[in-house]
Amino acid sequence: MSTSVSFARDTPTSNATLMRKYDAVAYAAKSNALSHPDHIAVVATLFGLDPADVATCRVLELGCSDGANLLPMAASLTDASFVGCDLSPRAITAARSAVAELGLSNVALFEGDLSAMPETLGDFDYMIAHGVYSWVPATVRDALFALARRRLKRNGILFVSYNVYPGCHVRKAVWESLHLHVERIEGASARLDAARAFAAALAEPGTTQNPIDALLRHEFRQVTQITDSALYHDDLAEPNDPVYFHELASPRRQNGDRNALRAQRVTISVLSPRRSFR
């Protein structure tokens, strides 16, 4: 039987704002093969780590949304156990419905802030934070790694995906211009329409041969083609903060968190710069 529990309902203002945004426009979650424990375990082994047996592992996904990534894992690994956590009541409700429809008995779902997850959940062999790190406040980022330090088992693996510099510098320029254009516009639908119209205008072919102009036009053209979900929760999201790898790794090294650092090295080695993280 799946577990359905709410916790930390008195979330900070920043988290409450994030929760409202995800309830205003549903995030179209999808599965990500790179975050599957089987894939993580293989790559981790190649890097000299000794990960847990995937068949009987314990997995925690932070920001599980409606379960599109977590539930297929649970359905295929019936002797493993899975826990999903998300701020959005709308997403967790959808995930619970899917668990019931699929008849899964190895899934527990929690609605609330990851920094206040109950100790009764136990420890985990694999922790997944896909499409979370770059889109949450600094306090939540710190809480993510603090949780990993407390709750990862020996030889546990933390999978983190995030927007990374220097590759995101051009995209960041596009995101900032979109933000400036829509900052005074109220309502999700109106903001989406305005952002698309703005991007379409700037994607029009220009007369210059400047390669930077061509690159920017390409990025604006991409904005006109992505889904409302991706535009609202990625390009128009606040925060949306890419980081350099050393910014992610250095604090973990200073805290003596060698396993998290090694896991980050594994993760960054298998994520192509052309892949969409979310």
Region roles according to the model:
Residues 24, 32-57, 72:
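Conserved alpha-helix/loop element of class I SAM-dependent methyltransferases that forms part
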Residues 55-65, 157-186, 190, 194-211:
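Conserved class I S-adenosyl-L-methionine
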Residues 66-79:
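Conserved SAM-binding loop of SAM-dependent methyltransferases across substrates and taxa
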Residues 88-89:
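Conserved SAM/SAH-binding beta-strand->alpha-helix loop
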Residues 103-114:
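Conserved SAM-binding strand-loop segment of SAM-dependent methyltransferases
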Residues 118-127:
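A short acidic, Gly/Pro-enriched loop at the edge of an enzyme's catalytic core
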Residues 142-154:
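A short glycine-rich, Lys/Arg-flanked "PGG" loop and its adjoining helix->strand segment in the class I
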